[in-house]
């Protein structure tokens, strides 16, 4: 075809370089790009569409549980962060500070939001007077900034998009219930929508959020067997409430500090989705989060003008029927591109299902359907095209989860000695006994590159001996190399 574009660029194979494959995919699938601002990325429309769908699902899940959206300032007075000593110490190396504005030096510097516990507590202290004002359940969709030295698109950037939930409660029990409930929301979202199996559990003291009593996380395994912390939920206790004097008059008539939680997920989830499912041909997106479910590609070959018109009429009608069924559809009738180019292009950008239709298919009242994940042709009657497309997308969603879970489970091991831990350091999730000593944890990280991920809730915990020191251990914790 004269003037036709060349075949889509190939990605670095995962086996040759997983990191290079990932960067290739993100850029060539037009998900994100580098910017001239150090450590900051440009999220392109293909990537932002994924984030919008994640937002849509999560926002409904939050609101169904009674949370309401609000928005707080990007700039936080530096003194606010200093009110909670552990919090400012934990974030200090990552802070971006504004010292000048309007042509002059500020009396007090502002910190660009790394997270919003401090400034939100300032408002909570004004809004909450009585136990009748509780629980207070808020969520914020925002951008945050944490100065990162080593960045990677979606996974670790200086500026990123996220949601952060902030809640206040009467009792410690209520706060703990909320913390665990929101972790379960994240697990449900990761598994039911992202088709990404996760372990849920409690983080170690060194991995705990600065200023929290306890931190819980969801941990996923990527195809290179590294862990990705995909979401966190924190029981803040009364630490921030005491720092900002966030009190309420209780049912006993006395003043009490509120009990608080915070929880969040970010655009890092997009990186997790990519590394869980995608292949050497490009992006694979679980249908529940896809912006485009179906691409219809007319196949003309040596068809006459009349035959082309018939094919286009049918493909337009089919596209309309699929859209009525609630699917995102693209009709790719660009005659400057060959069918082969279009196949590669839509595999690269992660379109879930391809439908091919030419004059010969039309004569048989059939079409060809190809699922993105298995890439096998299936001949389908046009009378059943809509129901078959929906069934294939449902099957794809389930199969992606099953495949990812099988991969994770086959790379999860119990280890019973330090030698075994070191030998299996690159093999996935390692369940090992540890004595809870942060110094031992730091030694393991330095000598093996392994970090503690979480103490899984669904693992029956039995006492044992620390694999490093032989000292008593209350149970096994997941060690893994991680992003």
Swiss-Prot record:
Its main location: cytoplasm. This is Proline--tRNA ligase. Signal peptide: none annotated. It comes from Myxococcus xanthus (strain DK1622). Catalyzes the attachment of proline to tRNA(Pro) in a two-step reaction: proline is first activated by ATP to form Pro-AMP and then transferred to the acceptor end of tRNA(Pro). GO terms for biological process: prolyl-tRNA aminoacylation. Consists of three domains: the N-terminal catalytic domain, the anticodon-binding domain and the C-terminal extension. InterPro entries: aa-tRNA-synt_IIb, aa-tRNA-synth_II, aa-tRNA-synth_II/BPL/LPL, Anticodon-bd, Anticodon-bd_dom_sf, Pro-tRNA-ligase_IIa, Pro-tRNA-ligase_IIa_arc-type, Pro-tRNA_ligase_II_C. It is found in: Cytoplasm. GO terms for molecular function: ATP binding; proline-tRNA ligase activity. Belongs to the class-II aminoacyl-tRNA synthetase family. ProS type 3 subfamily. Its EC number is 6.1.1.15. Keywords: Aminoacyl-tRNA synthetase, ATP-binding, Cytoplasm, Ligase, Nucleotide-binding, Protein biosynthesis. PANTHER family: BIFUNCTIONAL GLUTAMATE_PROLINE--TRNA LIGASE, PROLYL-TRNA SYNTHETASE. Pfam families: HGTP_anticodon, ProRS-C_1, tRNA-synt_2b. Homodimer. HAMAP family: Pro_tRNA_synth_type3. GO terms for cellular component: aminoacyl-tRNA synthetase multienzyme complex; cytoplasm.
